[in-house]
Amino acid sequence: TGGGLAWGGGCSPSLTPELVMFTDNADPVKLLALDMKTGEIVASLPVLDDLPEGYQVAVENSAIVYDDSEGTVSTIVCNWFGAGNAGLADPNNDSSIQSYANIYDQNWLMKGNCMIAPGVERVDTIKTDSGYEMKSIWSRNDLSDTSILKLSTATGYIYGYVQDLESGMWQYIILDFATGETVFTMDVSNKYGYNNMAIGMYAGNSGNALYCPTGYLE
């Protein structure tokens, strides 16, 4: 798509006992399921392909993958287009040479997630008698998240760190894994420095705490 941080796909592969899951960088971007033993593509599906006109897609993080051990593998794919400016659209630009200044550019730092294209989608890969098939379960075209979403199978919730674009408020957000609906938000701050700048959120070892690094000191 020419809008990511490199010409290839940026989605690190995630593994199940039978499959390797990742997205490509085609147009449209597709989720791929490869056979773990042979490398054969056993299923694929365009993802994040129903965004409003003008938005592009680049997946630059590892997708959430959950295997329920009953024949269904659920994958959560998140759009990162706009998270940094690698200049891939410029034919004279050498995309192999990057710097702090263009990956963490000032527009993104100051303006926040209005610079990030929206899109979060859940796709299920289902094992059938004849192989595998993929289907979209839900999609959210109103969320921009670069915190590397976290899934808790104990609660059935997906946890993230987003910005309300109307108020500028940075928030922790909880989504229902089954439906994709927002079930809870908690305000953090509307100061620009609370932008996580694609630094991944993580959970504490107690299982009851979430942490998302930002660039703000106070």
Task: Give, region by region, the residue ranges found by the protein language model.
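Loop/turn-rich, solvent-exposed surfaces of beta-rich toroidal or solenoidal domains
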Residues: 18-24, 29, 61-191
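Acidic, glycine-rich loop-and-beta core segments that form the ion-binding/anion-interacting portion
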Residues: 6-51
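Blade-level signature of beta-propeller repeat domains, shared across WD40, Kelch, NHL, RCC1
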Residues: 195-218
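A generic structural motif
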Residues: 46-49, 189, 216
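Residue-level signal for well-ordered, solvent-exposed loop/turn and beta-edge residues enriched
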Residues: 40, 179-181, 208
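Short, flexible helix-coil linker/hinge segments at the edges of structured domains or between repeats
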Residues: 1-4
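Repeated scaffold domains used in trafficking and secretory/extracellular systems
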Residues: 6-12, 52-66, 142-151, 192-203
